[in-house]
Structure formats: structure tokens, C-alpha cells
């Protein structure tokens, strides 16, 4: 009698384990993977090709002329003879990542050489940018220029990068290094929106050795 009970118990246990296994397998099979998101909780565009950016490297930079909040114009033509760092970003809406990078660039002694110009390119109206300075006063130390209607960002293929939180409309978190002859030597797009001063300094060091 006990043997019959033990056999029945074993059979029941096997059936239960098998049923649980089927439920787990079925659940994992039907599970939809959550999309990768950036630090702002926005989906990262995974099908974005870096080809348009790579095609700009070692070619003459698109012409630009951008003004800071005081109306001073910074143009590619007038900056010939200097190495240029352009940091294309979303500006006001990209807090704190883009703001932190803008401040980091402004405070870095390695970029205060007279042969180097660092421009943080935002798409906000100049009057609106004052709100950011009020919230983070260190931003006043940076050279921020304003890209009306994102026209220059578009010329540099900055509106369809993996870092763009508003794909096709606004830039994200992308760096461009232009040499003294106006040729693009380095482009880096970062969906993680980290600080990249060391990488930029290394790229400028390469230019000084050429």
C-alpha cells in the first residue's frame, strides 16, 4: 500500500514540475524585450547608421556662422588657423548630461590654448538659455552658440544620430574636431551622454603631432 502511495506521489510531483516548466518556457517565449533606453529614459535608436558621420571625416567641414548670446559671430572661415571642437547637443532639455559636458569643456585647462576654440552648439533661443545659466551659473563660462532652426546641425548630419532624443529634429550628444585647415578629423556620437574631455584632448594632441 505504501509503495502505491509513494509511486502516486512521485507521479504527481513529476506532473507538477512538468507543468511549471511549461509555464515558465511559454512565458519566456512570449516575453517582449524592453527597448534599450538612455539615461533620460528615452529609447535608444538602434538602427541608426554611423555612416553619414564617418563620411564627413577627413573632408572639409560644412561652412557655419553661429552667434553667442552677446551676438558675437563664430564662423569657420574666421576660425581658420585654430583647432575647433564643436559639441552639438540639445541644450535646455538635456539636463544634466549636456550641461555638465558644456561646463566641463569650459573649465578644462587643456582647451584654453589660444590655438583651440570650443563651441557648444545648442538649438535654444538665446533668451531662453539664460534660464540654464540661472540654474547652473558655471554655464556662463562656456562659449555657447545658437543654431537657429537646427540648420547647422542638419548640415553636419547631427539630427539623425543614435544620441538624439528627438530623432530627425534635434541633435543629441555629438563631438566634432576640426583642424586648422577646416578639415573634420574626428567625430564621436555618444548615446550614453558621458563626459569626453580626455578623448577630445587626445584627438587634439594627434593634430599637434602632425
Feature names for model-found ranges:
Residues 74-105:
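Short active-site neighborhood of thiol/selenol oxidoreductases, capturing the structured segment around
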Residues 140-143, 158-176:
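Structural micro-motif
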Amino acid at each position: 500500500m505504501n509503495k502505491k502511495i509513494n509511486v502516486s506521489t512521485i507521479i504527481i510531483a513529476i506532473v507538477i514540475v512538468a507543468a511549471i516548466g511549461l509555464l515558465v518556457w511559454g512565458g519566456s517565449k512570449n516575453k517582449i524585450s524592453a527597448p534599450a533606453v538612455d539615461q533620460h529614459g528615452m529609447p535608444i535608436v538602434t538602427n541608426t547608421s554611423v555612416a553619414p558621420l564617418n563620411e564627413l571625416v577627413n573632408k572639409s567641414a560644412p561652412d557655419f556662422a553661429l552667434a553667442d548670446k552677446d551676438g558675437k559671430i563664430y564662423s569657420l572661415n574666421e576660425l581658420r588657423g585654430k583647432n575647433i571642437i564643436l559639441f552639438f547637443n540639445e541644450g535646455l532639455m538635456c539636463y544634466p548630461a549636456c550641461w555638465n559636458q558644456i561646463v566641463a569643456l569650459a573649465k578644462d585647462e587643456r582647451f584654453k590654448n589660444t590655438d583651440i576654440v570650443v563651441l557648444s552648439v545648442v538649438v535654444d533661443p538665446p533668451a531662453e538659455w539664460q534660464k540654464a545659466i540661472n540654474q547652473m551659473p558655471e554655464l556662463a563660462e562656456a562659449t555657447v552658440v545658437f543654431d537657429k532652426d537646427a540648420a547647422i546641425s542638419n548640415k553636419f548630419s547631427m539630427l539623425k544620430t543614435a544620441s538624439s532624443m528627438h530623432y530627425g529634429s534635434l541633435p543629441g550628444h555629438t563631438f566634432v574636431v576640426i583642424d586648422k585647415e577646416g578639415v573634420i578629423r574626428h567625430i564621436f556620437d555618444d548615446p550614453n551622454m558621458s563626459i569626453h574631455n580626455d578623448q577630445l584632448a587626445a584627438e587634439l594632441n594627434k593634430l599637434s603631432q602632425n
